[in-house]
Each structure stands twice: as structure tokens, then as C-alpha cells.
Amino acid sequence: MERVLSNTQMRAADAYTVKVQGQSAQTLMARAGAAIADEVEKIMKKHGFKSAVVVCGSGNNGGDGYVCAESLKNRGIAVSVYAVAEPTSEECILARKACTAEFTHEINADLIVDCIFGTGLCRDIGGKFAEAVNAVNASGAYVVSADIPSGLNGDNGLIQGCAVKADLTLVIAEYKLGHFLNDGLDLCGKTVKKDIGIICPQTTYAEIYSDDDLKPFFIGRKRNSHKGTYGSANIIAGSSEYLGAAALACGAALKSGCGYVKLTTAEMVKLSLVPVYPQVIFSDGIDFNSHSIAIGMGCGVSKDLYNKIIYILENYEGALIIDADGLNALSE
């Protein structure tokens, strides 16, 4: 399980680490830049890349880039810096002054490190910043984004004007909501989290689970067992308009390990489902003896569906999933 923070929560974690834990913002930037350089060095060795350019913005994400460039230079890697704009944050100003890497006016290298904007971006990108983003995307180079692809909103994963499409995103400290929402799923590429010592004081946050987190819930079946050993589910799904919804729902229930899957649906849906999942049992009504009930998928919004959901809510004590048209019916 990994924490997933909003932009506000991440800023609070940064402030807590600086003010309460006594770590300076410059120290955190030094760690972030070094962590980015570590990963860039690995990638360059793996792919045989000969050159890198770090594209730096004017804020702290740009500061991370200057530190990264200096670290790569000290390791003997051919690296240059493309400064999109003059530094504006105190930490970025100091990082640029300390950077002795060569500066360039071209975004052209085997590998590009995107340090233009981080999660602090609160406007659509335009002007020279948009030109830099578009140049990165048009370069054909391997692109590594620091924390989040520039131009991607850290809260909702939407593009703000334009955005970098990364091959790899090095997530600093904690994952952000934008990594997993909307355009973030297409722009982040592979994600790798880098711990730089930022402390998260929040106790309430979103979470994301990996395959390893979920494996304990999918136990192997014992030989001395039968379908009834592994629970039952009643799926109320599908209609003449949405034949496939029932198949998708039943398939998901079976893949979860459910022993008995009972489907309540229209006659034509039954005929289409038998060749796909012959083990599914058909039921004409609601089975309140099932361990779980799922309702709404492809049913079509109707008063009848609404009444069924209310009836189940009032009379059923097992696990209940209301999805798709079920939610739409309740909202009307």
C-alpha cells in the first residue's frame, strides 16, 4: 500500500518536515536532485545513452533539476542545462548558482530530464514554457519527469494547457492523485518513488494497492472443497441494450474467487452468457441468501431498478455493491 496525497497535503508534508523536523528546504532539494541523478545514471547505463539535458523551470522543481545536473556532471556524465526562465524561488536561485554544468539553448540529447513544473502549477502553460514542453515531446528522447510531468495537474491529472509525456516519472516523497487520474495515466509512463526524508503528518489520505498487497486475499483452493466453500454472489445486471455488462460483472466475480455466481437478468442476456461462463447459475429473483449482491451494471435506469435497490437496502445484511445504472437510478 502506498499513500496518495493531494497537492495541499504534499505542501503540508513539506512544511511539517521543514518547520517541525528541522530539515531545511535546501537540504530536501539536494536530496531530490541527487535521487533524480541516481535514477538517470542507471537509465543511461542501461540504454547506452551518451548525453542528457536537464530542462529547468523557475521554481523548486527547476531547483531539483539544477542539483541533478550538477550531480550528473560530477559523475562524469555528459550533461547540459536548458533554463526555460530565470529562477524565482530562493532555493532555485541558490541551486542555479551552485550548478557548474554547461548551459545550452537546445533541447537535444539522448535523455531529457523534465524539471519545468512540479505540483505547484496552478495555471495553464503558455509562452516559452509551452514551447519548452512541446520541444521535449517532439525530441524523440527518453524523458524522465521529476515528481510529475510538467503541465499535469497534481490533484486531478488533467493537462493544464500542454504537458510533457514522460517515459518515467520519479515521484518525490509521495504519490500524488494526478499520477493516477485522467491524463496522468497516459503521461506519467512508469513511476518510481524516491524517498527524500519528507514526513507525512496526515492520518487521512487516499491509498493505492499493488498486486503484492492483494495476493493474500486470493488464497489457493483446497482439494477437499467445493464451490459452496468459496461463497456466493448474486449479480443483478444486464438488459437487452447492454448484453455485455452481465458477462463483465460475472467474470469479475468468478475471478475474485467466488464459488457460486447467480445472475438475475433478462432472458436474452442468459442466452448470450452461457457460452462465455457456463458455470453461472440463473436466478429469477433476488437471492438474499447470497454472501454478496451486486446490482446496476447495464440494467438501464428505471423506477423498477430504483425500487429493487431500496428493497435490498432495507432487507439485506450482506455485502452490497451498487454500480453504474444503480447509482444513476439513485441519483434521479
Region spans (language model):
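A short, aliphatic-rich alpha-helical micro-motif
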Residues: 106-110, 163, 287-288, 313
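Short, hinge-like loop/turn segments at secondary-structure boundaries
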Residues: 96-99, 160-164, 187-188, 277-282
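Nucleotide and nucleotide-moiety/phosphate-recognizing core
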Residues: 38-116, 124-146, 316-318
